[in-house]
Amino acid sequence: MADEGKSYSEHDDERVNFPQRKKKGRGPFRWKYGEGNRRSGRGGSGIRSSRLEEDDGDVAMSDAQDGPRVRYNPYTTRPNRRGDTWHDRDRIHVTVRRDRAPPERGGAGTSQDGTSKNWFKITIPYGRKYDKAWLLSMIQSKCSVPFTPIEFHYENTRAQFFVEDASTASALKAVNYKILDRENRRISIIINSSAPPHTILNELKPEQVEQLKLIMSKRYDGSQQALDLKGLRSDPDLVAQNIDVVLNRRSCMAATLRIIEENIPELLSLNLSNNRLYRLDDMSSIVQKAPNLKILNLSGNELKSERELDKIKGLKLEELWLDGNSLCDTFRDQSTYISAIRERFPKLLRLDGHELPPPIAFDVEAPTTLPPCKGSYFGTENLKSLVLHFLQQYYAIYDSGDRQGLLDAYHDGACCSLSIPFIPQNPARSSLAEYFKDSRNVKKLKDPTLRFRLLKHTRLNVVAFLNELPKTQHDVNSFVVDISAQTSTLLCFSVNGVFKEVDGKSRDSLRAFTRTFIAVPASNSGLCIVNDELFVRNASSEEIQRAFAMPAPTPSSSPVPTLSPEQQEMLQAFSTQSGMNLEWSQKCLQDNNWDYTRSAQAFTHLKAKGEIPEVAFMK
């Protein structure tokens, strides 16, 4: 900070960094320098200054008294800081690497029953890019023993958590490189022995949480919906009761945010100044716990990079205070500083008390209504008749329970593929699990060998693959058909609709599908499929409500077994002349008491008005 020379002379002559080890009968500052020196592994008094990169942070004795401080102004010229060195200020620093177990204790902690526990830190390099739920479920699915991750968090690009026994750590070690991510890269898992995690050592007791809640209530202004937690650790009531609340500790920040969520989720303003915060990882959940927050004061802390703000950029802040953090020194001028902060908080109106120009908003707040989906598109009546006839035959066989009859529908060199949406959670627990192993979602699948293997070649392999898929019943009334390309030797069309599974674990589950066929003319004046792409997803609530509103008839090789020979002959003739299938032709004849002339007149009248559904022509 620009004013660092002054703050050093006023406060830092008493500064001491120390690990937060709780001992009975000792206050938080009664710690032996010699003991810490041995544990740090660096003898002598000339110990190198270093940030304690742990949850309890770099804690100064001066925190107990809120002395004067020169306010940092990012809009003025910054003096050179290089003249201020640690040895000029008579400060004593101790570095403790807590994830390295001290020789005399190993990675052991002590359980409540007095037995010894070995703790291990699990590190996943580049784990920050993975969703927590997906990552843990994938590790659990490959791990031979169940485990409970303690203190899962992200540290820079890494994901980390702790486990409390050697057998679990050994099982997790065996998972190393066994998991493929969505880009088909193997995930590394590193195991190190460790001291007990801070949430175990520094967990606030229930009675301490209640006291913290009481103190926060005293600091809350209901009329402004504002909570002032400035210099919380040095609060006189907390100090008097020997409750050490350090917001750099994950457990303390979690307890604070939980109190906010449970008691004042409508919070508009939060002051966290002068709490020596050097990272905001543990604050990320504030986006959900206080979604209405508009004003946030982080001044007088120790944030080094504006990237820390990425962890809370989901907040719709209008006012932010950052002065007094070293991150302000990293910008060459005022406009760069404002741009970097506004990139995270585009609705920001005030920064460090300065009014900002109104934000340029490109987002449209007003709700937009999507145009309604149109019906099928066939181009010509001849193509319509050809495609609907093909689909009627195809899905009658597909839903029959034996799909071997589809062999005649495919070309000898046909190919087929299936894809489903990417499943971030454990695929084995997804309702689409039966489709997952065959999914060729090229947006996520990068391995060319696997891409090729999941593409089914030749009609025998295609039909064998289709036979392995769950048995289905399609709602033909839901079909929307679009012809997208047509030449004299090729036809490309897609079908959208819904179906339900009729057996297995997902019986009666409703799915939506899109299927794209590329076909060539067949010898029987029909179509022969050369390419078949099937996309399956879970049906939406609207699709579920509309599905099977008119029950589709069960496919049968003899659709009119109860008719007399004369009626069957009339039915065949009417179906041929009208172009309708047997089911709808029979309905038309029955509605007109099997009077052929009246039925023909009714058909002509209804067709002219466009009141006959397309499904009536699917044969």
From Swiss-Prot:
Region described as Interaction with ALYREF/THOC4 and LUZP4: 2-198
SMART domains xrefs: TAP_C
Region span, RNA-binding (RBD): 2-118
Annotated stretches, region: Major non-specific RNA-binding: 61-118
Residues modified to N-acetylalanine: 2
Record-level Gene Ontology MF annotations: mRNA binding; RNA binding
Domain (NTF2) ranges: 386-536
Motif (Nuclear export signal): 83-110
LRR repeats: 266-291, 292-315, 316-343, 344-371
Residues where Omega-N-methylarginine is found: 42
Region spans: Disordered: 1-85
Pfam families per UniProt: LRR_NXF1-5 (PF24048), NXF_NTF2 (PF22602), Tap-RNA_bind (PF09162), TAP_C (PF03943)
Consequence the record notes for mutating residue 91 to A: Greatly reduces RNA binding and no effect on interaction with ALYREF/THOC4
Modified residues (Asymmetric dimethylarginine): 42
Modified residues (Phosphoserine): 9
Minor non-specific RNA-binding, as annotated region: 2-60
Positions occupied by motif Nuclear localization signal: 67-100
Tissue distribution: Expressed ubiquitously.
The protein, known as: Nuclear RNA export factor 1
Organism: Homo sapiens (Human)
UniProt lineage: Eukaryota, Metazoa, Chordata, Craniata, Vertebrata
